[in-house]
Amino acid sequence: RDDSTKPLASFVVTEYSVSNQKNRPVMFSFNGGPGSASLWLHMGVLGPKVVKVPSDASDDGSPPYNLINNKLSPLDKADLVFIDPIGTGYSRPLGEHEGKEFWGVKQDAVVIAEFIRRWINDNKRWNSPRYILGESYGGIRGPLLVSELRSGVLTNIEVNGLLLVSPAADMQYIRFAPGNNSPHYGYLPTYAVTAYYHGKVDTDLTLLEFYENSKKFSLEKYGPALLKGTRISQEEYDEIVKEYSFYTGLSEEFVRNSDLRVEASDFRKELLRDEGFSVGRADSRYKMKDYVAAGQYPDTDASMEGFSSAYVSALHTWFSEIGVETVMLYQSSDRDLYNNWDWNSTQDQKW
């Protein structure tokens, strides 16, 4: 609600509580994106029930799906609250308000912090140890949430712990842009193990040995070479092309044409182009046939085709089993949210 108590948006969360203890730890969890709902952590890692998908990336993503008890759920140690940001899950803006009002680095942190404050107050959990767990973009949202929660003059809320899962703590290292070399040497070891998995490298090394060597090459030779820009010698350039090709399974011609800088989408398309496949983004072990092998970008994310439906279906199945009934559709992700995200809203942030 705003200062006049008019409703702005509706947060619909999933919470699990195993006792009435008012000082039992509680953990607030969310996935990243921005634009992702929390079902991935909920049904894949933390919840009392999780969906079991094959670990060898061979599944085609078709039902039925196997919903199993999660012996590793932290529910025996803490109550769990899975947060779906506005525009994801069942959380929606209300009345005349639009999702864009909540879609930004600062806006997102403010509204989720306000939800956490209200949840603590409504559930009388002011004396409970509080933990925040964020995945991917949660590496940015999490620290901002801690700051927002601590900033309240009358409702200052301290957090006992912040847990980050594969965090995107620095967007510079994952966003490809002209002049930004960071993601190129940061991604290379992932390219290397992907090429190794798909049989595109000629080596007798084990996967771990190959991975460690690729990291060494990336940090000690490839990264410094990129920083030299046009000052790099032809001899060094040719050597980098050769080694880059060896580690990634891409042709030397393609590496040259990319000027040593291959973006992730290009790699996913090029690695298995000769076979007519592209590899997955979320999990590069998955591969899927492309309709047009000559295109620049993959037709789809093969990995999401492999397991996305399993998570969505498992969540609805679980909700049905525990008596949750709604005519709303659960929004697992929202591309419109990501495309309209305000990345500049923290420029005036005071730390």
Region spans (language model):
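Residue in the alpha/beta-hydrolase core beta-strand immediately N-terminal to the catalytic nucleophile
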Residues: D84, Y131, G161-L163
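Alpha/beta-hydrolase fold nucleophile elbow
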Residues: K124-Y137
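Glycine-rich nucleophile elbow surrounding the catalytic serine of serine-hydrolase chemistry
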Residues: G134-S147
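Asp/Glu-centered strand-loop micro-motifs enriched in Gly/Pro and often flanked by an aromatic residue
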Residues: R1-N20, N121, W343-W351
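N-terminal cap/lid subdomain of alpha/beta-hydrolase-fold enzymes
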Residues: P7-E101
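Alpha/beta-hydrolase fold catalytic core
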Residues: K228-W351
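A catalytic-pocket lid/entrance helix-loop region that shapes and gates access to the active site
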Residues: G47-V53, S58, V146, R150-G249
